[in-house]
């Protein structure tokens, strides 16, 4: 109605932060563009190569000018990534030196974006959620971080002789064309990358299927199957890239929409070990030891991916 009183948001003074608020990750270039919550934080705009701010996951209609509207401020400085994260009261500061980054995972599940930085020190990873519509800006940030953590790298490893450049015929990947498309994007942006291996998604069965409990488990898995999701591995002389789903394991018949990319500097890999999966037959778990941090990749036991990981070239070998 025309005579209805204005909403609370419109009765409050407008602010530049509120005017610009939306689901997008923005680049920050001036002190005025820094969200007010973080303005006293340890971020040097002049010395940072890229600074971005990540908005809260709320609808525009639910925002007000008096709210702190940004969840994170990320600054790629000369030696470290600094992440300021909003809390109920104030914010926390996390500093991740580039030399201690073990792996970077980024990707989306529809519009649910997630960036995770794994440290080689064994501490908890740093995770930032964002709207998937801003994946391009997040990719720019990841590219800056990777350039810094590869600076001075002397890995220069010789890839396996059967590593292949260019196009690959992905058989049985009809349900995972999104991963194939992501692999194509990697090749276009990084021509030096070579294909190592891939495995398609497959339904798996429990390893121990004896007795009454085994029969019950088989019945449950028949009605509600467990699927090990597909993945593609590629590399250049300094980095391993794994293209995968956010969840390696999916139960039932639910559709899978996520696409993630994990990059690992080869220089950080101390060793790779493979062990049989505790529950599922025909699956091995490759553990990449990166300092005090371990990343696990489940792959089919007889797949090219398992073979590639068994003979992975390591700088410390």
Give each language-model segment a name.
Residues 89, 93-98, 116-118:
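"Short basic amphipathic alpha-helical interaction patches in structured regions
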Residues 1-68, 74, 78, 109-110, ...:
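Intrinsic disorder/low-complexity detector
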Residues 96-100, 106, 110:
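Elongated alpha-helical scaffolds
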């Amino acid at each position: 109605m025309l005579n209805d009183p204005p909403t609370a948001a419109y009765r409050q003074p407008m602010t530049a932060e509120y005017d610009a608020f939306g689901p997008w990750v923005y680049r920050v270039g001036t002190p005025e563009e820094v969200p007010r919550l973080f303005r006293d934080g340890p971020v040097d705009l002049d010395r940072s190569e890229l600074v971005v701010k990540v908005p809260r996951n709320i609808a525009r209609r639910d925002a007000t000018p008096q709210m702190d509207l940004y969840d994170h401020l990320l600054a790629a400085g000369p030696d470290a990534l600094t992440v300021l994260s909003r809390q109920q009261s104030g914010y926390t500061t996390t500093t991740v030196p580039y030399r201690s980054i073990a792996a970077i995972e980024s990707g989306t599940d529809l519009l649910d974006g997630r960036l995770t930085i794994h440290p080689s020190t064994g501490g908890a990873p740093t995770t930032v959620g964002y709207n998937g519509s801003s994946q391009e800006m997040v990719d720019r940030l990841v590219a800056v971080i990777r350039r810094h953590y590869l600076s001075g790298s002397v890995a220069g490893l010789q890839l396996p002789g059967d590593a292949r450049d260019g196009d690959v015929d992905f058989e049985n990947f009809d349900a995972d064309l999104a991963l194939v498309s992501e692999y194509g994007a990697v090749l276009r942006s990084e021509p030096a990358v070579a294909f190592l291996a891939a495995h398609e998604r497959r339904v798996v069965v429990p390893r121990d299927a004896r007795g009454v409990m085994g029969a019950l488990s088989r019945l449950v898995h028949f009605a509600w199957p467990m699927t090990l999701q597909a993945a593609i591995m590629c590399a250049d002389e300094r980095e391993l890239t794994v293209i995968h789903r956010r969840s390696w394991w999916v139960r039932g018949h639910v559709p899978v929409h996520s696409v993630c990319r994990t990059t690992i500097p080869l220089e950080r890999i101390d060793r790779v070990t493979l062990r049989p999966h505790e529950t599922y037959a025909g699956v091995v778990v490759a553990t990449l030891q990166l300092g005090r941090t371990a990343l696990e990749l489940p792959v089919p036991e007889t797949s090219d991916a398992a073979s590639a990981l068994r003979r992975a070239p390591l700088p410390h070998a």
